Amino acid sequence: MVPSREFFEEEMDRVLENEAQKLSLTNLLKNVFAQTLDMKPEGVLTTEEALLAWLVDECKKEYLHQLIELVMQVPVSVEAPTTSAINNSLGIIRQTHGQGEDNFGRLLCSLSFASCFLELVLQSDERCLSVFASELAKFYVESQNLWLAYSGGLSAGLRERFPRSWLYFALKQKWLRFIYFFK
């Protein structure tokens, strides 16, 4: 029996939606990491990006010692140091999400670890940042999609859990876009 045309169209729509989610999350993560690593993000950050970058910075400040210890324990291969470093650190993030119920706390811890890792091991290299953000987005879209959907998506989840901070960054980012527009 040959699958129907509708089946192929539905499958293609699902694949395209999945790829669009990955691309969107990759861009968001690149901008968040660029902001936390004092690199220039692409344009003015969105409210989600600005709030997430601030939360990651606060998490890094509070747990810097523990994060540095974790980063220094990541094994790195001599033959392909960048590739092995990225794969091993992503393995740690997968293990973090594999234990217990997922929540925004785990997301913030993972992003804080990733930010420290990018800064200390990969030395804030822009190409490594892009590869790392892409692989991390792929992990979240493929493995954590149910949790993200259940929490209403990243934007709605952040707005619900951090309402005052969300409002502050929404106003701040609108003001920055206004200023940026007139430059």
Curated annotation (Swiss-Prot):
PROSITE patterns: BCL2_FAMILY
Domain of life from the UniProt record: Viruses
Pfam family, one: BALF1
SMART domains registered for this protein in UniProt: BCL
GO biological process terms held by the UniProt record: regulation of apoptotic process
Family: Belongs to the Bcl-2 family.
Protein name, per record: Uncharacterized gene E4 protein
Gene name of the encoded protein: E4
